[in-house]
Amino acid sequence: MGRMSDQPARWTEATVYPDMWTDPDNDPRESDGPSPDGELPTLLDFLSGYRITLRMKCEGLDPEQLARRSVPPSTMSLLGLVRHLAEVELDWRGWIEGESIPKLYGKKDADFEGAVADQAVVDAAYADLEREQAATDAALAARPDLGERLKNGTSIRELMVHRIEEYARHCGHADLLRECVDGRVGQ
């Protein structure tokens, strides 16, 4: 662990609310409109917010910063989180479709271990995440009944809540990882 002076100074772009990532006028998660009506639109709204948050935590960083590991022995990095969430989106689609889909990155933990400081790896990770999110979203759009049970016994509702929980948990990790990289803070 480095000395205190080795740590980046904490900072935020926000001027209105210093505990935020950016000011409300610049925050893509902010909406002046009413909150969604209904359970499914509410779940989708929360999921969207966490997806945007993950992207925001990674913005402005180069491949080395994105691939920087957290605290040993962890292999966690911001780039690893992007790859991991692409992998779990693929897994969820397998649940929905009732079939086993081959892993994107191979063996267990390859999503984190393969997160290296290479622009091609970064570009591929973002492309994988966008593709897998869209594919899982499309598979779920065909099943609007939240009470429907999948082949493995999981309800669509449970899957949606699990997706939100997975993104929320990893956005918390991303908060800490980003602060360690360059000191930027804010929710």
Question: How should these model regions be labeled?
Answer:
Residues 2-26, 30-32, 40-111, 150-187:
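Short, contiguous alpha-helical
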Residues 28-33, 120-124:
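Long, acidic, intrinsically disordered low-complexity segments
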Residues 37-43, 122-123:
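Active-site rim elements
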Residues 110-147, 158-163:
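Acidic/histidine-rich alpha-helical segments that form the ligand environment
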